[in-house]
């Protein structure tokens, strides 16, 4: 049977309490994820970091 390579992670805004949920491949992306996404509370793009 195949092992689970994908993990559900939470992306938390660096400037507010807004969050996104996404899936990442544990084999290909070993470090923590950082993405620039739209913050709905601040109404602008900010950096979202992986939180566990």
Swiss-Prot record:
One function term, GO molecular function aspect? structural constituent of ribosome
Q: Which GO terms describe its biological process?
A: translation
For the keyword Electron transport, the answer is no
A Pfam family: Ribosomal_L33
Domain of life per record: Bacteria
GO CC annotations on file? cytosolic large ribosomal subunit
Spell out the PROSITE patterns in the cross-references.
RIBOSOMAL_L33
Task: For this UniProt record, give its keywords in alphabetical order, as a comma-separated list.
Answer: Ribonucleoprotein, Ribosomal protein
InterPro entries noted in UniProt: Ribosomal_bL33, Ribosomal_bL33_CS, Ribosomal_bL33_sf, Ribosomal_zn-bd
Record's PANTHER family?
54S RIBOSOMAL PROTEIN L39, MITOCHONDRIAL (PTHR15238), LARGE RIBOSOMAL SUBUNIT PROTEIN BL33M (PTHR15238:SF1)
Q: Which family does it belong to?
A: Belongs to the bacterial ribosomal protein bL33 family.
- This chain's protein is named Large ribosomal subunit protein bL33
Q: Which organism is it from?
A: Chlamydia pneumoniae (Chlamydophila pneumoniae)
Q: Which gene encodes it?
A: rpmG
